Amino acid sequence: MLEPITGRYVHIALGERPHRVYFEEAGEGWPLLCLHTAGADGRQFRHLMTDAAITSRWRVLAFDMPRHGKSLPPAGWQDEEYRLTTDAYVEMIVAFCQALGLARPVVLGCSIGGKIVLELALRAPERFRALIGLEAAAHQEPWYDDTSWLHRPDVHGGELCSALMSGLIAPHAPAESRWETLWMYAQGGPGVFRGDLHFYRAEGDLRGRVDRIDTTRCPLYLLTGEYDFSCTPDDTRATGARIPGARVTIMKELGHFPMSEHPQRFREYLLPVLEEIRGTAGASEARDA
C-alpha cells in the first residue's frame, strides 16, 4: 500500500546562505503548515497526512528544519555552534511559505513550533488564516539544568535526548507511538537539540509582549496536554489569559507530543479546531470578497 505522502526538497536562502530543505505534504485545500518540536523532524505529523478527514480539505505540509531529519546543515556547519534564534526561525517559516506560494496558511506548531506561533501572531498576523500553538506559552521555567551535557563526546546525545523526552509522554500513549516518538530524538544530530533549546529556554522569551497579540487579525488557538510538565497547562492558561480572544484547550490523556504520541486522541481535539477555522475564516473571506 502506498501512502499519499509526497516528499520533496526546496532550495531557499536563510541568513543569506543557501539551504536545501526537505518537506512532506499530502491532501488538497487550504494549506496547513506543521512545525515540529525541538530536536525532531516532520515525521511527527505523518498521521495527520494520512487522515482522510483532514487531507480531504487541507493541504498538510511539514518541513524538516535545517540540521533536522532529511534537511542537511548549511556548508560550514562544522565551524560554528548551532543556536536557534527567533529571527532565524521566523525567516525560515516565511521563506518556506514564499517558496511554495502558500497563501495565508494555517500554521500548527508544537513546543518550539508552538512558541514561534506566538511570535508569528505578533509580527505578521496578516500572513496567516489562523495559528495553532500546541504545548505553547510565553515562557516556560526550565525543568532541567545546564544543557551542556546534551552535547559532549562521552555521552550518546541521541539516547540521552530520547530518555529526557520519555517522561513528557502521557501514560495513555500506545507503546508503538511512544517509541516512535522517542526514536526521532535518538536520531538527532550532534548539538541540534541543545541548539533548539536556546530558543525555547532563553532567547524566545515572550513575557511582556503577548498581550499585544490581536486575535481579531488572526485567530489563535492554544492546546496543551495535561501531562506536559515542560509547558504545563498552567503555563498555557496564563499565556491565554493575557491574549484577548485566544482559545485555550487542555487536552486530556496527552503529553508534550500529541500528534505523534497518541494521534487518535489528538485528532479529537484538532478536528473541531480545523472545522471552526474553516467556518470563521471562510465567512470572513466571503465578506471581504
Please give the residue ranges for each predicted region.
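Active-site loop/oxyanion-hole signature of alpha/beta-hydrolase fold enzymes
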Residues: 16, 56, 61-108, 268
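Gly/Ala-rich beta-loop-alpha elbow adjacent to hydrolase catalytic centers
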Residues: 109, 113, 117
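Conserved alpha/beta-hydrolase catalytic His-Asp/Glu region
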Residues: 142-143, 158-214
